[in-house]
């Protein structure tokens, strides 16, 4: 190796070492990591100890078969583990139910957290009777870590709360207070839940009362662990997995997310405002009044054979005033990923305090999302407000979009007509210049276009305007919850695929079913391609283009087979309107008049003096032709 190679290796090594040095964690970060690891290990050890003691007490009570207090030695052990919280080790199992017009939640006595949530306005796929259940039993767990004044670390999920108060006011707002008692007089911890009369948002306040008597004096924050397993709610598991992901927003408004395709993990030292456990159409969002600190989040997919699709985990820290002078306030959003519903939570809210929950609805890239927000969603909401069937709504949206694009489509069809009129002359050029003289053929073709005043690229202009709208609908329809459960013809749910044939062995890139709307859309696309290609010029190079154009619809059949039937229905209707527009234009345009107009323009241009740029361009073309002829002669002499 030469000197430069050794220098290169040395520089690379220096960069690697320098990068490692600059990115190593600080002493404070290392200390925080060690504290978290130590506390987790200590919690696990003490949980095991408490569990063993609790099992001993239960076994003794069963042996004695009397409702007496445990023996003195076990009671002492229990007090040693739980300290003033020993009374909370025994209690009532079950849930307390709260409900309003939209949700029904169950708050568990053990742990004092929301253990069940149902959405009254929605049904699970294949169940037309029972409300959709977001989670139940052990699918959702919320746990807080407490440090006692004897430096014991306890977790709320192992302790029993009591229902201290439950009341509903005249407006239908319900309040429930779950209390964690101690053996110290007037010393307890309250979880206060507030359920408005007609909302998906549930308030949760953590209110200590004289807890400085039971907890460590230096305890100013508590760790929180929130885990949830997301059950499959939809027919199409593949799409549900694609849209299910963990998202979170920093204080300040920036939104980030974990991977929806594979297991992922994030360690965030920055303050976080909310964390969302998201499914395709529904979300559970935890919102902090202040912020979540030092947060670790994980997301992992389940095996395809499981009834669950994703598992989410969060470990974070919340500020806590143990004197109770200030409550720690949280909010739960338990509801649909409906754009307007989520956006309404930012109404009349100053910019810095906006939650931006509507970003949970994926609307595509910036320009595509912008089109969805200012055009597609308002138009969709308008037609839906008329009480129309969802199929008619999509039909009207297609018609409006086609009317908006009509001027551009007209210009494209006019350009196509000119190309069609020039087809005989283009065929003559192709016959005159064989494929071996491709450069001369292209020059003659461009000269014809220039003379006739035709631009072969002008037909692409409408596609430039149509493409963002097509992409906007591509993003909007599969995530529009209004399509969920809505039927049209043979499709029983427009939010998922409409299989008419199924089989057991998966076909690569296709799956185990055939969607009828997708098949119809493909057939109509082939018909449109055939009509379009009939108007194109011939030539050897166009034969390959034709095959490619016919291949595209077949590729769409594979691509859209798993997509929402509502999206395939939209593309089918859109293509049908396009074919009708093309045929009407073809029937109303006189090719002879177009040819006469082009000849008149050509004569007019021929009488006009060429611009300096046009003259220079023509001179360059002549020079290229001369050089090409000289090169050909030189090769023949050899």
Model-derived features: positions:
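Compositionally biased amphipathic helical and low-complexity segments enriched in hydrophobic
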Residues: 31, 49, 53, 62, ...
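Intrinsically disordered/low-complexity terminal segments and short unstructured peptides
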Residues: 4, 67-68, 155
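Soluble non-transmembrane domains of integral membrane proteins
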Residues: 88-355
